[in-house]
Amino acid sequence: MSSASRLQNVNIVSNNYSRYGTSVYDKLYHSNGSGSNNAGKNSTTVGKLSSISQKSRSKQRHGSNCSRSMSQSPLSTFKSPLSNQNQSSAPDDLASIGQRRSDDVTSLDNETIITMNSRKSRIKKKYKSLISTSSKKFMNKLYDHGASSDSFSIFSLKTSHSGKHENSRFEKLRKRKYHAWGKFADINDLPVEIIAKILSEFELGRDQKTLVRCLYVSKKFYKATKIVLYRLPYFTSTYRVAQFVTSLRLHPDNGAYVKVLDLSHLKPGIIGQDSKDSQGLDDDGHSRRHRRRRRRSTNTSLNLPPATPTSTISNEDDANSGLIKDDASNGSEVEDLALAGWRDWRYRNEPLYSSPLLNSFKLKKVVSRSSSITSTSSGNSTGVHSTRRQRSNSSVASITTSIMSSIYNTSHVSLSSTTSNTSNGNISSGSNLSRVSTAGSLKKASAKSTRSSPQKAKPISDITSSSWFRMRLSSRNRKARTANTINLKNSKDKSDDDFKVLKHDSGHPSNYRSSTLKFSIEQPFSTHHPYANKFLLKYAPYKDLPLGYILHMLNLCPNLVELNLSNLVICTDFKLINQRSERRRMTSSLLPAVQESSVSAGPEKDLEIVYMTDSGKGYEYYEGLSKKHSRSSSLGTNPSSWIGGQANWTDYPPPIDAQTKTREEHRRNNTLNNKNVVLKKLNPFEIFEMICNRNEEKGGYCSLTKVKMNDIVWCRQYMVKYFVMRTFRQHLDYKSMENNSYERHLFSFRDSGLDRNFSWACNAKLHEFVALMVMDHLSNLDDLGLEELFNIKSEKLYIKNYCCRDPDILEISNLFDIRYGAGSEADATSDSNLEAESLQFRLTILKTEKPTSFWLTKVSKDYVSLVVKLCVDDDIDMDKMKVGKPTLRIDSITHNLISRLKELRRVDLRRNVGENNYYAESII
């Protein structure tokens, strides 16, 4: 074999021949003794071959469809240069080499075509991108070196997605910045206070529903929303105030969010009356429109009838309609519909007051139905005695029917505003659960009975009380309850986003309309204000609150900034004091005592009873407990009472009756700790005392800077004096008078007290109230007290000291004490054990040509100096000057005080002149 036949095929993919070595290049394209011409031709041939190989490589990347063209193109290109070479002067050995080269390429091309058609080649095509070939290595190096610097190239880092680009410089910088900066913060990364500030915009926009829905977003939103909701609670109903107090007692942490407590907008519970006094609204026509709109919105949201009772009789009988009007006029004497108050919440666990069948709405409904049925029966009867008998029977029947309908979940609309259909004689109602016969059907039944027996008309009360009617009514109610239970079981798996619809199909004719029951998922807005119990309806015109509720709120809200108790009426309350008494041990045991574990009856029932209004028991109940305890203690200490004949049956523990559910409840209500209870009547003075004690515990820091108590009669003068003076004393002890920190406190007692002409019954700051208290104290002194305080009788003995005094000084008083506390006034309660405190002052009155002004100065630790610069210019009208009402009152009191002092000096001078004349006459 020749050397050319032993050469291997080399695929040249680049013009960089140094990669393959010069020996291979010389053996392929250079022969021994060849000239420069042949070398140049061979170089061009090799260049063509390299370009052809690159084109074939680029075509090979596109897919299997172009494989045949790629295999045929090198054959033609290889033949053309070699044939040209053979036509020119070329050696024979080179021609033979080219001929074999073309044969080899053709054979390789045929093998490639056969391989591509095979099944193995088709499998390889799927994994072709994963195979690392020489061409792929070349392209990767091309990306790394040539195109990475060109941002507009398709091989740049911005457009390529190769594996090596992940480790490029840009990716490293990006990862470095990510680790340095971390994750981008969102709204949940903000502090709770900042989120609460953002959510407070909903409160400013009066969007309360959106604010409440923010409670269900996330935990951080829940905390922030609670801060906004509890910051300024708004109450118009005493029932909601009672709920709020119980909620704070169950969750004391929420009380720290309350900043403003406003109880000045409470309204009475009566609705439906047109009298302005009972509603407590404005005198304009807007109050009546607001009341109607409120009643209409309440009835619409609750699916209730209007507040005024509607007629339940068809309009065919004009005589009956006239009787309805007369009965409606008589029914106006009955109290109207009323909303629940704090007493309804207090007795919510009592069976007599907690039943929904006995609320004022059911009472209104029963009255309207009884009047309508009475008018129908009276139209059919003739005698007076029969009318009276039918009236009573129909009332009893209507009450029984309404209560039975309420038990079976009958809608209120079907009970109070049902109508009759006389065209087809069928009963039509608002719900298929309602099984109450309307007046039209009853009238039709009575007409049939009249035609069958014309001698005597059967009264409607007999129809409703017949055994057939009761049997028919019970069967229909049983079917309705069965259908309701089946539909409720079938609808457990059906849930929507907003509500669930339950359709009750009871198999009745088509004229029966199926009702729809909707369950709303908006829990905060699904419960409406309840109605008052009919036994508590007499308290509906009042808007009072027990004193214990106010003390609870002040105790549970330590961060109050503003307190508004204007227009508030306080109800009498008592504090429960448990007295521990030693019980005589009859036996002794060496075994350790076993403590009985108590069973919890619920979070609300486990709350400690601090005040009497915290429980559902009345004053007589606790008085009876104290009497029982006193008798049992006397029986244990007096030996003569141990005889069985002197023991009373009430001394023994009562048996557990059917109303007591568990023995734990019986044990809780009959323990010795509860029996030994002493009731102490609460005084409104404790409101001010609690505020001052809380400030004392905080080291003189008073967060409560605004107190409003306007138009209240329970606020007495000694209460206001104690509150003002003790607050001022705390500023003297813990703070400096130079920074004027007391000027931040703003108090308002406008038109309060039993006398509205009090000097302190106004709006003023703390230092203004102190000045008013001092001047009011001096103005209330008698003549002897003023003479002693201002040295009127003794100043002539110290004439030298008074002559050298500054002429601008009108009066200077001695030191005097102002006593404040529960025992400092004559109108204070005698049972108060709080000792009266005192604070020393000195008054200095200066004259000036400018408007009156004053200031307080702490001269020493012993007393405080009050300086009043009194305007003596009569041309200046203080009423027209821009001064506050406290300054005007101080100016008026000071002028009166100066006039009294001048009159006392004139009287003393006249007395002294008379004495001198008498002494001179006696000498002569």
Swiss-Prot record:
Domain of life: Eukaryota
Coiled coil: none
Residue span(s) of domain F-box: 185-236
Amino acid composition bias (Low complexity), ranges on this chain: 369-385, 414-434
GO biological process, one term: signal transduction
Biased composition (Basic residues): 287-297
Family matches, as InterPro entries: F-box-like_dom_sf
Ranges of Basic and acidic residues composition bias in the record: 274-286
Cellular component terms (Gene Ontology): mitochondrion
Annotated signal sequence range: none
Skewed-composition ranges (Polar residues): 63-90, 298-314
Swiss-Prot/TrEMBL keywords: Ubl conjugation pathway
Residue ranges, annotated region (Disordered): 35-103, 271-328, 369-396, 414-460
The keyword Acetylation appears for this protein: no
Disulfide bonds: none
Role: F-box protein probably involved in ubiquitin conjugation pathway. Involved in the resistance to ciclopirox olamine (CPO), a synthetic antifungal agent.
Name the record gives this protein: F-box protein COS111
Organism of this sequence: Saccharomyces cerevisiae (strain ATCC 204508 / S288c) (Baker's yeast)
